[in-house]
């Protein structure tokens, strides 16, 4: 079931003409029972949202008002329930001025009568028959249902009868005529809009206070009727224009509020309470009539006590004379109408003081704000937050597009643009411009100088690559290498008669493929060394492919020609299979016979290298910012990260800020291959650099930038992209992956933590160990890094139940003790193939051993002896092989095995022996079996464990 957000519900209500702010809508939903709604971004189920929409629409949608009569001076007023009063004629002639009598209100019997709306068209009723008065026809006045009874009639009316059960409100009958004919009375003025009481303010000019009871003349029954002379012959009162007393729209709304009768259930009034008492608190049982009006200053609500006006013998809010009305303003008229009223405020809930701020409004974003700027990718969660859309909707749309993603998955800019377009957004790419920090400099031919050639020596292991370089450099590097093989890539600068040459020595072992590939990528020329007595080998072919892939020139040096088994022609023939044809045979490849031991052919080799460099026209600009490639990297204690770099362009100086991969730093020191510190290095020379923030990856490019801040920004940008790629990559499961997972479901895995001296060795060892995995046992590298073995490595291995493999590195102090406490095994190696062989043994140890039964001999039971405290002993004669004390035994009777166990004791005469050979007699005790009988055969054997094969 889909969901709908609160602000979407607000938009639907707005279309229906109901405008609610987000806060008001949330409060309204809380009042309806949806307490889980927290803000305008919260979601509701479709059925819940529809139900809330219908409730709010039914409550807030204005209903058509009933047709009410209108006219000048008339105000529509609602009453809860009004009983028609019984009018009687006065027993004596009225005084000079008729007085106001307090109207009598019917009291409810049990409960307050429910309010029912009056009908739109009310039919007038006939007035009840007056007592002791001449019967005259009562003419119904217009809108009699809304007209109030005259004060004169109220004065003569007896107590009203008890209220009947709730019935529809009937129109009030017009007052009956009295002894003296009276003119029609104007309608009683309705209550005015409430205002806060102002006791300290003096009455307005021209306002006459209310007269005492009996001092006012009766009011006319009909509006606008001429006034009649009083009983004492006083002059008639001038008619009052109703338009002068017509209330405003605000007053009409307030005046139209219903009166709320309030009753307290108390004991009957005693005789003492019937006499006047001093002013003070009202006695219990008093009935007060209250009116609900908006509170002063618009706060909460208030009750107006209108009982005080009734006790004083006048109607609340009675109209004033025309002369007084002319001298008062509208505001003074309103104050006069509501004066002398008692207010009973409702105590509201005290609100905590909060900062007054603008309410959150549902608005539409401007067009310039509907632009999403992203780099190469963005996560689904970030895109949903920017657009204000549910992430589940975006994931559903991506699934329809055929992309299985999660909320944290990264999507490219094109896919994000498609999703954004559906919601009215546009996507702009704001890719990180690396060129701003690493600008490309135009080549200035006038500043180019000749640089030394970079020559990489490649070939199979033990074919004499390092020995050949030693002969050229007149050094003895090969003698100090572990196992006599090169396991690091070495960079050397050699001064020859033909000029300086930079040599890169690469390993020949199969595990160092990545090193050979890096050497081929940075070189200008490849010297392929092939042993004359061994010929072309697998790593020779691999080196040829790497050189051709890099597009560099290959020069073949056929080494070890001084050996008796040397066959240079056979080597040249084998190389033709790989499209390397010697110049002697009409080809283009230079092939020279050399000998590292006798230095035969070395001068010719150097001359050909110089010749090829001249043909290639190797030049570079030394005045620009330096750039190059990382050849090797390592972590040394006391020196930190150390990178061997090859400068390809520009000049690298101490203090330069450089960036390589995700690492950056400032050059603190530089040293050449002889360990001498240098201040600057030109193009074509190798050097060791100190000062980086971490160990870079061998093969990465490095660039010098203006300052360290720029280098840090570039490195952080690359690190962010790498992390996004690792976390947000979407990998589709293929059928082959499922089959591979099913095959390896029962496979055992050997976890390893690899630490090496340099980055290249760490990479090579990890790849070699991973290749050692078989179908029965797999290999998983938990961590591969450079540097000494630390406590962190031990804890990582302990958590992953792994073995630590150290290659040309040693553990720190007390690390071995911590490893023994944690139960972690540390294996140290200096030669890579020794590490591979030892790890295969560890892999075989994970397999369950195979138990094999090996027969030893047989013995026949001749006699059975029962020895106290020892048990049953079978006197037997060894008929085949030998019976050993530590062997297992099967008891066979009638060619059926009835028991299998171990030999408990073996004696010859009275001496304990370890074994008894064939032809001798002995006593054999079987553990856990005491039912040996004469004639049983005891078959003795032993169990041996056989380690299973990894293949």
From Swiss-Prot:
Residues 505-508 are annotated as: G3. Residues 484-488 are annotated as: G2. PROSITE patterns: G_TR_2 (PS51722), IF2 (PS01176). GTP binds at residues 459-466, 505-509, 559-562. GO terms for molecular function: GTP binding; GTPase activity; translation initiation factor activity. Residues 171-216 have a biased composition (Pro residues). This is Translation initiation factor IF-2. GO terms for cellular component: cytosol. Residues 58-255, 305-329 are annotated as: Disordered. Belongs to the TRAFAC class translation factor GTPase superfamily. Classic translation factor GTPase family. IF-2 subfamily. InterPro entries: EF-G-like_DII, IF2_II, IF2_N, P-loop_NTPase, Small_GTP-bd, T_Tr_GTP-bd_dom, TF_IF2_bacterial-like, TIF_IF2.
């Amino acid at each position: 079931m889909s969901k709908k957000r609160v602000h979407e519900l607000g938009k639907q209500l707005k279309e229906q003409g109901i405008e609610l702010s987000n806060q008001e809508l949330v409060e309204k939903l809380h009042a309806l029972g949806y307490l889980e709604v927290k803000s305008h971004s919260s979601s509701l189920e479709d059925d819940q949202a529809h139900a809330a929409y219908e409730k709010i629409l039914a409550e807030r949608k204005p209903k058509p008002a009933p047709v009410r009569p209108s006219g000048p001076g008339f105000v529509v007023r609602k009453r809860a329930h009004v009983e028609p009063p019984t009018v009687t004629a006065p027993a004596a002639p009225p005084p000079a001025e008729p007085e106001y009598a307090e109207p009598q209100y019917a009291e409810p019997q049990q409960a307050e009568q429910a309010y029912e709306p009056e009908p739109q068209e009310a039919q007038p009723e006939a007035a009840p028959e007056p007592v002791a008065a001449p019967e005259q026809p009562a003419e119904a006045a217009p809108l009699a249902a809304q007209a109030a009874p005259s004060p004169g009639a109220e004065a003569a009316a007896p107590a009203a009868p008890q209220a009947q059960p709730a019935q529809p409100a009937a129109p009030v009958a017009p007052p009956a005529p009295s002894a003296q004919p009276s003119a029609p009375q104007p309608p009683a003025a309705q209550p005015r809009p409430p205002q806060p009481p102002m006791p300290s303010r003096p009455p307005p000019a021209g306002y006459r206070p209310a007269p005492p009871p009996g001092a006012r003349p009766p009011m006319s029954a009909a509006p606008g009727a001429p006034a009649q002379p009083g009983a004492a012959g006083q002059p008639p009162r001038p008619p009052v224009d109703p338009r002068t007393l017509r209330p405003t729209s605000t007053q009409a709304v307030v005046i139209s509020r219903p009166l709320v009768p309030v009753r307290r259930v108390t004991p009957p009034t005693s005789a003492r309470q019937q006499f006047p008492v001093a002013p003070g608190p009202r006695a219990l049982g008093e009935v007060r009539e209250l009116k609900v009006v908006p509170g002063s200053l618009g706060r909460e609500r208030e009750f107006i006590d209108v009982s005080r006006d009734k006790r004083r013998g006048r109607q609340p809010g009675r109209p004033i004379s025309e002369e007084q009305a002319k001298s008062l303003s509208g505001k003074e008229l309103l104050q006069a109408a509501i004066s002398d009223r008692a207010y009973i405020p409702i105590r509201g809930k005290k609100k905590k003081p909060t900062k007054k701020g603008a309410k959150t409004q549902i608005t539409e974003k401007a067009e310039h704000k509907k632009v999403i700027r992203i780099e190469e990718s963005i996560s689904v969660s970030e895109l949903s937050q920017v657009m204000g859309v549910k992430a589940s909707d975006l994931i559903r749309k991506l699934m329809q597009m055929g992309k299985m993603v999660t909320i944290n998955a990264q999507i490219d800019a094109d896919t994000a643009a498609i999703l954004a377009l559906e919601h009215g957004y546009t996507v702009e790419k704001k890719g990180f411009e690396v060129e701003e920090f690493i600008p490309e400099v135009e080549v200035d031919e006038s500043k180019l100088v000749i640089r030394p050639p970079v020559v990489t020596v490649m070939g199979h292991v033990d074919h004499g690559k390092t020995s050949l370089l030693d002969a050229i450099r007149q050094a003895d590097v090969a003698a100090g290498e572990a196992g006599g093989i090169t396991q690091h890539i070495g960079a050397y600068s050699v001064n020859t008669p033909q000029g300086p040459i930079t040599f890169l020595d690469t390993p020949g072992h199969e595990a160092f493929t990545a090193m050979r590939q890096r050497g081929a990528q940075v070189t200008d020329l490849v010297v392929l060394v092939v042993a004359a007595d061994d010929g072309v080998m697998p790593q020779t072919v691999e080196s040829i492919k790497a050189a051709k892939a890099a597009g560099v020139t290959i020069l073949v040096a056929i080494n070890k020609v001084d050996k008796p088994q040397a066959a240079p022609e056979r080597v040249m023939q084998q190389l033709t299979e790989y499209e390397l044809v010697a110049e002697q045979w009409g080809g283009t490849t230079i092939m020279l016979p050399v000998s590292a031991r006798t230095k035969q052919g070395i001068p010719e080799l150097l001359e050909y290298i110089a010749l090829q460099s001249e043909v290639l026209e190797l030049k570079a600009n030394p005045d620009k910012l330096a750039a190059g490639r990382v050849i090797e990297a390592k972590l040394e204690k006391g020196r930190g990260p150390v990178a061997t770099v090859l400068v390809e362009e520009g000049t690298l100086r101490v203090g330069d800020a450089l960036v390589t991969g995700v690492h950056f730093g400032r050059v603190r020191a530089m040293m050449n291959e002889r360990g001498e510190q240098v201040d600057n290095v030109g193009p074509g020379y190798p050097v060791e650099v100190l000062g980086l923030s971490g160990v870079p990856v061998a093969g990465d490019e490095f660039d010098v930038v203006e300052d360290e801040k720029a280098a840090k920004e570039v490195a952080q940008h690359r690190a962010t992209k790498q992390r996004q790629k690792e976390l947000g990559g979407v990998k589709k499961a293929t059928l082959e992956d499922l089959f591979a997972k099913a095959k390896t479901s029962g496979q055992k895995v050997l976890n390893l933590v690899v630490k090496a001296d340099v980055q290249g060795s760490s990479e090579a060892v990890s790849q070699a160990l991973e290749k050692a995995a078989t179908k029965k046992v797999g290999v998983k590298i938990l961590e591969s890094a450079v540097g000494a073995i630390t406590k962190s490595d031990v804890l990582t291995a302990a958590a992953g139940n792994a073995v630590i493999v150290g290659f040309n590195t040693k553990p720190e102090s007390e690390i071995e003790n911590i490893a023994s406490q944690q139960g972690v095994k540390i294996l140290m190696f200096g030669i890579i193939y020794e590490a591979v062989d030892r790890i295969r043994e560890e892999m075989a140890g994970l397999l369950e051993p195979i138990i094999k039964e090996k027969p030893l001999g047989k013995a026949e039971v001749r006699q059975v002896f029962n020895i106290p405290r020892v048990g049953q002993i079978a006197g037997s004669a060894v008929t085949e092989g030998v019976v050993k004390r530590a062997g297992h035994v099967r008891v066979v009777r009638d060619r059926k095995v009835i028991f299998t166990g171990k030999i408990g004791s073996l004696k010859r005469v009275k001496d304990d022996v370890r074994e008894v050979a064939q032809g001798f007699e002995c006593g054999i005790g079987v553990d856990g079996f005491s039912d040996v009988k004469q004639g049983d055969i005891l078959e003795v054997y032993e169990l041996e464990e056989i380690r299973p094969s990894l293949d």
